[in-house]
């Protein structure tokens, strides 16, 4: 993998990780169009450490507050407030993707990274996001969050294992279907992603240097630079998205997904771009 490839792919990762447009899908598309290869699940997972570091810093106060409340609540029942429950909800919601990620690791690295799968998921899931935005009442705030919500959003997060779906797209959509307000759905989804993505990135670190089923590999310095680029752009992206969702809906992203997905389907159908 050249330095130019590293910079472009890391930029794509950082800019799209928190937007409901699928960062892994964009990495697959960009690497196939411009570099005639696949960045691979391992490079994606490791570069995600940069964007997840960004979300940790952005939500640092929330994380410290929730963790403190959770630890205190374990000892003193009187301290079991909303933040204490939120700590448990993050744990509960993380379990589904951890289990499926381990069981379907090989499938994620091979078959589901076919561009036909990626762009089809990009287009089809646009309909899910649009429907969630249309039917979501957005009447429930954080005080009314329950463990059932955590389970549903956690299961929705597993859909992000398929490139083209989008982690934030699936979790925000699930939250909207449950009646959560848009900003809460986004914030809870980001908190839910932190432990799962960090675990995935660390687990995939060795394979990023010596991929078994992927053609593009990176050196240690390249992975470091990719992580730093993804961190800076990811921090900018998460701050922008949360401000955007306060005043705007998800239809903007639906339109973008349909446009990119349809264009890619045409390129694939005409043989301009190879699916694998």
From Swiss-Prot:
Its EC number is 3.6.1.27. GO terms for cellular component: plasma membrane. It is a multi-pass membrane protein. Keywords: Antibiotic resistance, Cell membrane, Cell shape, Cell wall biogenesis/degradation, Hydrolase, Membrane, Peptidoglycan synthesis, Transmembrane, Transmembrane helix. It catalyses: di-trans,octa-cis-undecaprenyl diphosphate + H2O = di-trans,octa-cis-undecaprenyl phosphate + phosphate + H(+). Its main location: membrane. The keyword Cell cycle does not apply. The chain crosses the membrane at residues 84-104, 115-135, 188-208, 222-242, 250-270. It holds the Pfam family BacA. GO terms for molecular function: undecaprenyl-diphosphatase activity. InterPro entries: UppP. It is found in: Cell membrane. The keyword Transcription does not apply. One of its GO terms (biological process) is cell wall organization. It comes from the Bacteria. Bacitracin is thought to be involved in the inhibition of peptidoglycan synthesis by sequestering undecaprenyl diphosphate, thereby reducing the pool of lipid carrier available. Belongs to the UppP family. Catalyzes the dephosphorylation of undecaprenyl diphosphate (UPP). Confers resistance to bacitracin. This is Undecaprenyl-diphosphatase. It comes from Mycobacterium tuberculosis (strain ATCC 25177 / H37Ra).
